[in-house]
């Protein structure tokens, strides 16, 4: 387990009862450690993302396709030119075709690579802004990324899932808190109102009963955990995100 990489896991364990056994999900670029806790005392942390695993009324899991790959974002972000070039030359398969073309022109480097078109998927959410609590952060991020008002979103706050994400390509660790929720819209209705934006290129919908990949494994763990008894919780069973925002 990567618990020693976490900045908040000791506080979470101290104040929240573990609800389910930890699992590890991994693919060729990420290793994710997930642990479910009864929500007894949770607070926003400026370095920890808050995300929602949301089910539609036609029983589909909402997932967002990022506009930029994780690797491209890291190459743009880092100021070290040697690191930029090293990441590009060694891992260009983890970029989209457009990103490879842009960086090839920028660096005047043309690495031998397969003709794949990388797309990284995430659940809607992000890092809370200063002064935001969990409901406010989720409301803002879901609206910005998916264009869904919080009146259509219902969150199960009886429990949460702490995730430690190791990106083995850029050699960094990230933390996230997942909540399970529902959207009172069908997948088609969500597609009709969605607007591509600077962060999210498009949406995909997963079948919760079958699939593969990291996003499916995360969702399966979360949905299985939602069936457990959350004794001692201080949350709500699918409360309106709008009401949670107003109450807090």
From Swiss-Prot:
Enzyme Commission number(s) of this protein: 3.1.3.-
Record domain Nudix hydrolase: where: 45-227
Inducers of expression: Expressed in the late phase of the viral replicative cycle.
Binding locations of Mn(2+): 145
Main location as per UniProt: host cell
Residues forming the catalytic site: 141 (nucleophile)
Protein's cellular compartments: Host mitochondrion
Residues that hold Mg(2+) according to the record: 132, 167
Cofactor(s) essential for the protein: Mg(2+); Mn(2+)
Chain ranges passing through the membrane: none
Keyword tags: Host mitochondrion, Hydrolase, Magnesium, Manganese, Metal-binding
Domain of life: Viruses
A GO cellular component entry from the record: host cell mitochondrion
InterPro entries per the UniProt record, alphabetical: NUDIX_hydrolase-like_dom_sf, NUDIX_hydrolase_CS, NUDIX_hydrolase_dom, Vaccinia_D10_decapping, Vaccinia_D10_N
Pfam families (alphabetical): NUDIX, VD10_N
Motif residue range(s): Nudix box: 126-147
GO molecular function annotations of the record: metal ion binding; phosphatase activity
Presence of keyword Acetylation: no
Family: Belongs to the Nudix hydrolase family.
Function: Decapping enzyme that remove the protective 5'-cap from both host and viral mRNAs to commit transcripts for decay by the cellular exonuclease XRN1. Preferentially targets spliced mRNAs and since all viral genes are intronless, it preferentially targets host over viral transcripts. Acceleration of the turnover of cellular transcripts promotes the shutoff of host protein synthesis and therefore diminish the magnitude of antiviral response.
Name by which UniProt lists this protein: mRNA-decapping protein OPG122
Gene (name only): OPG122
